[in-house]
Structure formats: structure tokens, C-alpha cells
A protein has these predicted regions:
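Acidic-leg catalytic submotif of subtilisin-like serine proteases
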Residues: 11-23
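Active-site-proximal loop/short-helix segments
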Residues: 21-41, 71-88
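Second-shell residues forming the walls of enzyme active-site clefts
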Residues: 56-57, 62-63, 67-215
Length: 219
């Protein structure tokens, strides 16, 4: 645990020196034999409680370096057998199975201030939408069941796991309950088109951001 914390502390110091204050890590996804290599060694293993503890240590290491961690990919990407950069990942596990495994690392660390959704479709909750675009998963599972009340950012909305155009994805992710919409590919036209009709940042999102900064500066 200390090795993990120290390793992420050193990563955080490097990022800080480069002027980067937020890191989209650590990964709290559980590793299965069938897990797609896109998760790979970013996962801390197959035991949900070990993943929980090591993920927490990684988050603390980044915090100690002055960098905000983002735990991902809530509510759990480990069961997916495809790469969500190119294909929509679908999870058919029951809620009972998910509660005994994939949900645990996120629920155990629900007090962390920042999380990123996975573009995973939980058929048992919402068979029609991936998490990023699903109010049923975001409000029903992430907010209510897991009790995560921090800042929620989407995974990259340019990824092919999602339907429709990028501007439509932005609208849908915010409507579903994401606080922030992430676009990583630098397509300026997409970005301009995406912000035309989006609502102003809500007071709740501002409160969550303020809480994130308070957490970073706390002992």
C-alpha cells in the first residue's frame, strides 16, 4: 500500500512540475480473466477489496503531491470484453453479482471528490443507454446506491462506444447527470458545436468543484 501511495506521489510531483493539476487516475476497475486489455495493468487486481485499498492509496499519493485524482471508470469497467474506444461494452451481470464485486471499490471510496463514468451499459439497470448517458445508472446506482456525491465527469465523448454526434452526446451526458463533459480529441468544430445549447454550470456542480478543492487542501 505504501509503495502504491509513494509511486503515485512521485507521478503527482511530475505532473505538478508540468503544470497539470488533475489526473484521470486511479483505475478502480476489477481485473477478470476476460477483461479487455484496454484496462490491462491499470487495474490493481481481481480482489475488489484489494483494489479498493490500493486505489485509495494511489488517490492519496496524488493528493499529497497537490494533484486531484479521478477514480474511474464508475460503476465498473472490468467485466467488459471490448474496447469502449471502438465498441459499446455491455455487461449482463445481475445487481447481486455487481454488488459483490465491481461496485465495491467505488462504494468503499465514495467520499473521494471526483469520478469518471465508464461507457458501459448495465443491462440490469438500463438496457438502452451506456452509463454516461443513463440517468438510471447515474442517479440510481452512482448517486443513490453508491452514495457518490462528488464531481462526475464523463469519459471521452469522442469514443465510438456512444451513439449519435459529439454535440448530441454532450447534451445527453449532462442531461443524464454528469457534471462535466469530456472531449479529448481537440476537434474545435465539435467543441464549438457542443457548447451552443448547453445550460450554464449548475450551482450543484459549482458546489462539488468547491468541495473537490477543499478536499485537496485538507490534511
Amino acid at each position: 500500500m505504501n509503495l502504491t501511495r509513494n509511486n503515485y506521489y512521485e507521478i503527482g510531483l511530475t505532473l505538478k512540475d508540468l503544470g497539470i493539476s488533475v489526473n484521470a487516475a486511479p483505475v478502480f476497475d476489477i481485473q477478470y480473466q476476460s477483461t479487455h486489455e484496454v484496462i490491462g495493468d491499470r487495474s490493481f487486481g481481481s480482489d475488489p477489496y484489494a483494489v479498493s485499498v490500493l486505489g485509495r492509496a494511489a488517490a492519496e499519493g496524488l493528493k499529497n503531491a497537490g494533484v486531484i485524482p479521478i477514480m474511474k471508470h464508475i460503476p465498473g469497467h472490468g467485466r467488459t470484453t471490448v474496447d469502449s474506444h471502438f465498441n459499446p461494452p455491455v455487461i449482463d451481470a445481475s445487481l447481486k453479482e455487481l454488488r459483490k464485486s465491481d461496485f465495491i471499490p467505488f462504494q468503499e471510496n465514495s467520499d473521494l471528490p471526483f469520478a469518471m463514468t465508464g461507457h458501459v451499459q448495465l443491462n440490469v439497470v438500463d438496457p438502452n443507454h451506456p452509463t454516461t448517458l443513463s440517468s438510471k445508472v447515474i442517479e440510481g446506482i452512482i448517486r443513490d446506491e453508491m452514495q457518490f456525491q462528488g464531481l462526475l465527469i464523463s469519459d471521452c465523448l469522442f469514443m465510438d462506444a456512444l451513439p449519435n454526434t459529439v454535440p448530441e452526446r454532450v447534451q445527453a451526458s449532462l442531461k443524464a447527470g454528469c457534471d462535466l463533459a469530456l472531449h479529448c480529441h481537440g476537434n474545435i468544430d465539435d467543441m464549438k458545436n457542443s457548447i451552443v445549447d448547453i445550460p450554464p454550470i449548475s450551482s450543484k456542480t459549482k458546489e462539488r468543484w468547491d468541495s473537490t478543492l477543499e478536499w485537496l487542501n485538507s490534511k
